[in-house]
């Protein structure tokens, strides 16, 4: 992992396939006059960030030894210490820019989606499942869109008319009640709508058809995934990623890219407009359903999101508070996407240990448990990673030490399991 204070912007215009996902190949101009932080001047967000030499960074960011296995960290690339060892304070302007595209043709997916078929699950069932996993079982239309894009790859490439079907089901008042709320208390004119399932205990009987259940049984993620979804144990995807990137460029939706976005934010890296080198298309198969459940309030994207420090609470959470800005190398980006289940296991372990920043594990832990050589490489590993696979085989490393054991099912879910059996 390298320390990097430069901002490079990649207008995506070419894509190639590799392995289980499609890396986004970019061409860019090194003479670009666009500057990320200058672009955020309209938000007026300034923060005093102490920066210091971090020769002891790997030790200070390690998780407590009782939480994760004791494994030696590899050497991290960093800037050489300067002559002045005293921490200096500089004012740095940071913020988040929404990816607003004038046309979807600006960024095109590389996937050959001719073999993708719409999941035979009704829109009313999709809306009900999204609502079931929302805090207080209340959800906005945008929350339903994000939930669908997050979990079913077909909709990332489909014509967006499906969103009209979602809105129609929510507003039909046959199965959902409507509430209004003010996302900004200071602005009385702006109001949003929440939708609530009528008779939430009757979702199975009223809203899920036999065809829906047949699809659940055949899904590659297994019946347990939908069992958790029925029980509300999946949760909603984190909203800020979808309001900035996922809804605007749907084929970049999904748990893998969402995790990358928040981990970068935790490292002090704000992803710039169309800076797509960090993201991948995961269209060959559905995600592995290893993501932990996040619980956060709905955040409506306004200028106050990046201008209020409280709304950027993940910023720098993966580093010491007096951090330098770290970045992923291209090789580490590949590893992050390939080993996403290991990353989610680290999050879950941090959560079990009651660590405050469990959503964004420390840089040291990501390097050790996600980029480390103790995790197995999947089939069709790109050439750039074959050296890691070879070393792992020579060392006799086969199993992921963070792989979760299957646990006994919650008795409260037995009825759901029986319904899905």
UniProtKB/Swiss-Prot annotation:
Keywords: DNA-binding, Nucleus, Transcription. The keyword Protein biosynthesis does not apply. It is found in: Nucleus. Disruption phenotype: RNAi-mediated knockdown causes significant reduction in the expression of 21U-RNAs, upon simultaneous knockdown of fkh-4 and fkh-5. InterPro entries: Fork_head_dom, FOX_domain-containing, TF_fork_head_CS_2, WH-like_DNA-bd_sf, WH_DNA-bd_sf. GO terms for cellular component: nucleus. Residues 118-218 bind DNA. The keyword Transcription applies. GO terms for biological process: anatomical structure morphogenesis; cell differentiation; regulation of transcription by RNA polymerase II. Its main location: nucleus. It holds the Pfam family Forkhead. PROSITE patterns: FORK_HEAD_2 (PS00658), FORK_HEAD_3 (PS50039). CDD domains: FH_FOX. One of its GO terms (molecular function) is RNA polymerase II transcription regulatory region sequence-specific DNA binding. Transcription factor. Binds to DNA sequence motif 5'-CTGTTTCA-3'. Regulates expression of a class of small RNAs, known as 21U-RNAs, perhaps acting redundantly with fkh-4 and fkh-5. This is Forkhead box protein fkh-3. The gene is fkh-3.
